Amino acid sequence: MSEMTPREIVSELDKHIIGQNNAKRSVAIALRNRWRRMQLNEELRHEVTPKNILMIGPTGVGKTEIARRLAKLANAPFIKVEATKFTEVGYVGKEVDSIIRDLTDAAVKMVRVQAIEKNRYRAEELAEERILDVLIPPAKNNWGQTEQQQEPSAARQAFRKKLREGQLDDKEIEIDLAAAPMGVEIMAPPGMEEMTSQLQSMFQNLGGQKQKARKLKIKDAMKLLIEEEAAKLVNPEELKQDAIDAVEQHGIVFIDEIDKICKRGESSGPDVSREGVQRDLLPLVEGCTVSTKHGMVKTDHILFIASGAFQIAKPSDLIPELQGRLPIRVELQALTTSDFERILTEPNASITVQYKALMATEGVNIEFTDSGIKRIAEAAWQVNESTENIGARRLHTVLERLMEEISYDASDLSGQNITIDADYVSKHLDALVADEDLSRFIL
């Protein structure tokens, strides 16, 4: 898991997300507390439970982006789910237990990649030997068995040197590779995904591992052989146990749109996709044991981060038991014009940088001036105020409209320099921004 300090985590998030310092600090502290807990003695470590977070803020201010960036920084099993995808146990739809199953699957993939990377050097050596065996077959005795030689032959050493220098990369050889497992597509009703995956695993394992001869260039064969040899060096049972440990000790679940499962007003009959889902989430957040195809997983120390816009519902509309299990509340602020200006220029891969790079592929040089950036930000803010406030997502709509003409004619504009200043933006957007009806449908 990540050993970054809260200050370092916030600094990394600052490269991609503008503002929202309170939210960044909260997730940074929560992530660092995962590391701190692992430094305690085992008895005390078991007693320290994660402080789950509820992020509250209008749409388009950075809640989901914080989750995306956190997943890359955490170096721990991480999954993001939409609360609206689930229904109460016993009804058609996904059960909340599938969150932990998906998290465990993600952990198995992560641990497998780490194990393969750890064994890569040894796998490269074994792959090299297999290719050399094809190029210079080893000597055999009278019974057809390969003789063990004390020292590699001079020819083998010469070919090894050429192989490492890349002189043989384009030479074609025929090698035996593990055949891909038999693919079986099984249709199952919603909520029975676990049974489907188990049946698919069973069919794939029928008949054992088969070899298939393939004719490939040496550089392509080397990549496949390294993967195959690295996979052989990994112990599947150890891998599963390591993955389960990683989920139990370091797992993070991000639940988006949690405000959409709040009960609104009085209603009769079962509320299977709202209050019912909240009741089913309770045991997961509090701590329970979930059965997965890799083994039993305890959720006591998994960190849950929930987020929602709460424009119609309020955090107090969540059932009291769930409110109590999300003790840290963070409010994200609506974005201003100056925030929009910073979003257009400061992030490492800002929208303007992306558009400039895309147009550069056609030989068109785009330059955004400070006045142009300011006018784009003002136009986006103005449309948000007069119609629906969708936060920073409005910048994508406005910029796409602004760049439409250039994008269409880019192949005919090769070699030209185009400056996007305040006058250019006003010429292309002012009429749309001023007309509220047009803004509502076009921007």
Swiss-Prot record:
The UniProt induction remark is: By heat shock.
Q: Which GO terms describe its cellular component?
A: HslUV protease complex
The record's listing under SMART domains reads: AAA (SM00382), ClpB_D2-small (SM01086)
Please state the span of the N-terminal signal peptide per the UniProt entry: none
Q: A Gene Ontology biological process annotation? A: protein unfolding
A Pfam family per the record: AAA_2
Which residues of this UniProt protein bind ATP?
I18, G60, V61, G62, K63, T64, E65, D256, E321, R393
Q: Where in the cell is it found?
A: Cytoplasm
Kindly give the InterPro entries that the UniProt entry links to this protein. AAA+_ATPase, ATP-dep_Clp_protease_ClpX, ATPase_AAA_core, Clp_ATPase_C, HslU, P-loop_NTPase
Q: Which PANTHER family match?
A: ATP-DEPENDENT CLP PROTEASE ATP-BINDING SUBUNIT CLPX-LIKE, MITOCHONDRIAL-RELATED, ATP-DEPENDENT PROTEASE ATPASE SUBUNIT HSLU
Tell me how this protein assembles: A double ring-shaped homohexamer of HslV is capped on each side by a ring-shaped HslU homohexamer. The assembly of the HslU/HslV complex is dependent on binding of ATP.
Q: Which family does it belong to?
A: Belongs to the ClpX chaperone family. HslU subfamily.
Q: What is this protein called?
A: ATP-dependent protease ATPase subunit HslU
> What is the originating organism of this protein?
Escherichia coli O157:H7 (strain EC4115 / EHEC)
Phylogenetic classification of the source organism: Bacteria, Pseudomonadati, Pseudomonadota, Gammaproteobacteria, Enterobacterales
Protein's gene:
hslU
